[in-house]
């Protein structure tokens, strides 16, 4: 086994064909690869291997230090518990690590129910490196920030890890480990070419608001630089033929200056791409809409949530019904 460690990530099956690229796992893989770690990816959701087939292909005849599974809470009982049962049967000396939006808020429950070893709470790029070093060096798990872990049927919570402030310091996702042809061609785009290769990316993390229904654990918004975003787009277009991008940001169109600077950079570099993104009605105006359209934006998603002001106030949206109407009007008029 690689002295710097060996990690397997399993992208569990969601029993559908239009699978979104697993961006979170791809970031973790990139960080580990940069450290010289051997990383393998099992894309169960793309190839629809049964748990038994997955075990034959990835677990029975191989050994790992960590086996990671990310998930949404809605998939836990239906999919993850059975998957973890299979992993535990064949994992040998590996630690079974859970992460994602499903694991972070209810780590105690998921660790006990799935009989996993560790749950990463919050962002995982720094935590996964520390966790692997802890495993291969046989160090104390209680010293690893940003995790909960199970020991003797008890769950222990360590100190929370602070979010990564400089997003440009995170390497681009490790696309080379994934079946990019499948991921880039299975999702319908809103672009002029419905068969254009499409992929998702993140230009920021977080949001300026704190709606009371939001799953986010951190406060505020952190931004990548425009140059860094443009370089990723160029790389994806050059290496994988991607021409349509879905911006996964909770709030892409903020601040206004960065949004316009991004649009200007797309135009200046003659990228000839199309994209869709999310916006808030209270920080959206006609000038922004014009630049977005010129840069290739084909679809804007506003979180209107309700046409009743009382409901918006209860949600703590900090927006008004009139702002919803005005934003929709501007977007339609600009086209």
Each language-model region and where it sits:
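N-terminal [4Fe-4S]-dependent radical SAM core
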Residues: 2-3, 8, 14, 144, ...
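A short, flexible N-terminal coil/short beta segment enriched in small residues
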Residues: 2-23, 31, 35
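Conserved beta-strand positions
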Residues: 9, 69, 98, 121, ...
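A short, glycine/small-residue-rich beta-strand->loop->alpha-helix junction that serves as a flexible
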Residues: 14-23, 72-77, 197
